[in-house]
Amino acid sequence: VDKQLAEYFRLPDDPRFSFAYSNGDGRTGFFRFANATCFGKISGQAPASSLDQPLPEVALRQANSGEQPFPFNPPDLIDSIRSECYASHTNGAGEKSLPKQIARIGYYAVREILPVTVRRHFQRMYLSGWQDLPFPKWPVDFTIDDLHEQFLRERMLANGVTQMPFIWFWPDAASACAIMTHDVEAAGGKAFCSRLMDIDDAHHIKSSFQVIPEVRYSVEPAFLDSIRTRGFEVNVHDLNHDGSLFKEREEFSRRAVKINRYISEFKALGFRAGAMYRNQDWMSELNLSYDMSVPNVAHLEPQRGGCCTVMPYFIGDIVELPLTMTQDYSLFHIMEDYSIDVWKRQIDLVGGRNGLMTFISHPDYLQDDRAQRVYTDLLAYLDDLRHERNYWIPLPYQAAQWWRDRRAMRLVKSSNGWTIEGPNANRARVAYATIDSPGLRYSLEPTVAQTQPVG
């Protein structure tokens, strides 16, 4: 079974589900396949060089069992979209333009002396037009998830398979997963962390705190211990949050040495880059278990793009937990929305696809009463969904470890049906993907106690 499908679904080994793929020909560009905007190489047609042009529609080819019907290489297509190779070809990739690079340098040079009202005005100008970006799709993009389902469905059809077993996405039959994370941006936010832990605890939700190691504020061992001893998690947040971590490779490598030292000193497993700047190809230089720097859709981030999936995935051996929910700062200060309506919409969308809901809220921006009320409304809503919809709300490192364990599990056929072997297999469940035009329908194998519908 192909690596991407194996990691996404954890299917049983079956040679019928492996193909020799076409690598496509000609240049790389945009096209449409199965109602999804795609970016890669295709055979027999010329893709569009930008989203401003008409996108050619790509159809499946007639194929017999064992032959691949796709006029492109599905694994390469998944990689090129999820790793954001398309971003430099879109109108939204303005981060690479000279005016925006100059604006970013100027902004970070004076950021610390600017009040939030001035920063907000500057950021709105910088992000202007975000509502008009056609790809990725806001508020949540499911391109990678749709493609995985389509690829599996077509292979099932080609082999006369109507139902396929796989290892369910989350432990204990949870229908979806939500994680709360807090990026601590300045000294005022650091001082509010204890109070924020009180608020989280009041709603029975543990969270992670991403701490900036240098420049912004002092980081005492006692501060880190105050987080860990209460059952919360400490991660590293950039190096100094100056917006230049990924500016050029040599400087990144120099900073990576220091970041790795702080990862060890902080006893951290996870990392998030400042302002969601990122280059997935460079992440292997960081000694991480998991990363949280890649948005699902980045229309409201200074670096546009997005991985277009609501599931964790691997960058080498690092588990990526993508940001799938709008940040609190963007909601309050860019969209000027002091309600949980946008979050509820995103929760419904991601939960409906059994995905990961990653939230970023900042202790720096939750200190006024209005913002705090919105945040507590969100926590109360998530706590309700934990019981009503069987959402799993772990610490981020637990979600990453589950995804790592799940990759090491395998489905084994026995006289009693399918069983799961591997680390934490006692928490895993056998699920089934059933062809349900035009997509797939998921169900969990019933236990003695109950049958649990999903999706």
Whereabouts are the PLM-identified features?
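Catalytic cores of extracellular degradative/oxidative enzymes
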Residues: 168, 184-280
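Catalytic domains of cell-wall/extracellular-matrix polysaccharide-remodeling enzymes
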Residues: 215-216, 243-323, 333, 340-343, ...
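Short amphipathic alpha-helices and their capping/turn segments at secondary-structure boundaries
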Residues: 221-228, 308-314, 345-349
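Conserved beta-strand positions in the central sheet of alpha/beta enzyme cores
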Residues: 235, 272, 291-292, 358-360
